[in-house]
């Protein structure tokens, strides 16, 4: 969460910031940049040690990021080769400030990542925010009564602080009071020529690489297995790539647990360490209000997918 001015005290900021402490139960921190406040709730995935805690700082600049930077080993190596940067953690997000020092806002188009970030530039004493091209990671913004910009991972952080909460546009960054587009998923690339077999092989290769880069984690990786095509493919690929038992989970409601059977078949086929969770219908219905409040959405598909996880 970020407040791009000193319009509130740290204690006031914390009151709104703590509405989403469940997003990061491992640690929490608020930094006063001198020109505003940055807050971060940590869910440790990469660089599990305290050195991986955000905000990261470099020469008076700070960054908070909810994201996964898939290309970070290559970028980190390139940055270290310049002789200008050293790193204190194994966190993928620690490369962001050095990347900004090297490339400015052009850094965003260089990232193979899903992310939402807020960056304070200590040299210009100004803020930048950005979101990945697809909008995988959530980010919201709004202006307070004085025209100050605020950002947060969830809309509920901003309720009571801004007059209107808006979703941050994917593929954009905000700088100098304006939004700038750095990526447009709607832009079609060149037409791929080839036979049907060649095109299918290309799809297969990309799918496998997409799963492989998401397996990099310092924390244990689990897989939600619904028994449908998508999750079954992902779990089968992961099991083959890791060469060991992966841990899969399936959630269903009592009286309508047909998906659990399909998930069980897949788990047996790939040899995973499988866990089933059956939720009584009454408990699922009773949880609806809490689920909607937690996810901050009335979207039917999102709510339906979230009840079992909750």
Regions found by a protein language model. Name each.
Residues 37-42, 62-67, 128-130:
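Active-site-proximal beta-strand elements of phosphoester/diester hydrolases
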Residues 4-11, 34-37, 81-83, 102, ...:
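ATP-dependent adenylate-handling active sites, centered on carboxylate activation for C-N bond formation
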Residues 24, 67, 96, 174, ...:
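Residue-level signal for inorganic ion chemistry
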Residues 45-64, 114-118, 160-167, 175, ...:
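Acidic loop->beta-strand submotif enriched in PP2C/PPM serine/threonine phosphatases
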Residues 39-50, 133:
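Short Ser/Thr-interspersed hydrophobic loop/turn segments at strand-loop and sheet-helix junctions
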Residues 30, 55-56, 87, 111, ...:
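Short clusters of hydrophobic/aromatic residues that line enzyme substrate/ligand-binding pockets
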Residues 103-111:
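Phosphate-interacting basic helix/loop segments used at nucleotide- and nucleic-acid interfaces
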Residues 2-6, 13-16, 22, 62, ...:
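N-terminal segments that mediate ammonia production and transfer
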């Amino acid at each position: 969460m970020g407040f791009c001015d000193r319009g509130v005290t740290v204690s006031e900021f914390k009151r709104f910031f703590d509405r989403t402490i469940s997003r990061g139960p491992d640690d929490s921190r608020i930094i006063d940049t001198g020109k505003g406040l940055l807050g971060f709730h940590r869910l440790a995935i990469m660089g599990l040690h305290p050195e991986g805690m955000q905000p990261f700082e470099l020469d008076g600049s700070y960054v908070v990021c909810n994201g996964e930077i898939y290309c970070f080993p290559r970028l980190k190596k390139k940055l270290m080769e310049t002789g200008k940067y050293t790193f204190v953690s194994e966190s993928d997000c620690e490369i962001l400030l050095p990347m900004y020092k090297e490339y400015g806002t052009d850094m965003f188009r260089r990232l193979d990542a899903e992310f939402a970030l807020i960056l304070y530039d200590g040299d210009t004493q100004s803020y930048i925010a950005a979101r990945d091209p697809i909008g995988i990671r959530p980010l919201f913004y709004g202006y307070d009564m004085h025209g100050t910009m605020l950002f947060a991972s969830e809309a509920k952080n901003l309720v009571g602080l801004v007059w209107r909460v808006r979703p941050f546009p994917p593929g954009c960054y905000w700088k100098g009071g304006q939004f700038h587009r750095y990526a447009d998923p709607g832009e079609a690339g060149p037409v791929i020529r080839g036979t049907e077999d060649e095109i299918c092989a290309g799809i297969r290769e990309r799918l496998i690489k997409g799963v492989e880069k998401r397996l990099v984690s310092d924390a244990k990786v689990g897989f939600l297995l619904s028994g449908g095509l998508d999750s079954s493919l992902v779990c089968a690929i992961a099991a083959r790539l890791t060469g060991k038992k992966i841990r899969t989970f399936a959630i269903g409601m009592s009286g309508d647990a047909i998906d659990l059977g399909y998930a069980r078949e897949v788990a047996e086929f790939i040899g995973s360490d499988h866990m089933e969770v059956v939720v009584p219908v009454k408990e699922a219905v009773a949880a609806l209000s809490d689920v909607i409040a937690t996810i901050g959405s009335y979207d039917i598909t999102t709510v339906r997918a979230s009840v079992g996880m909750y």
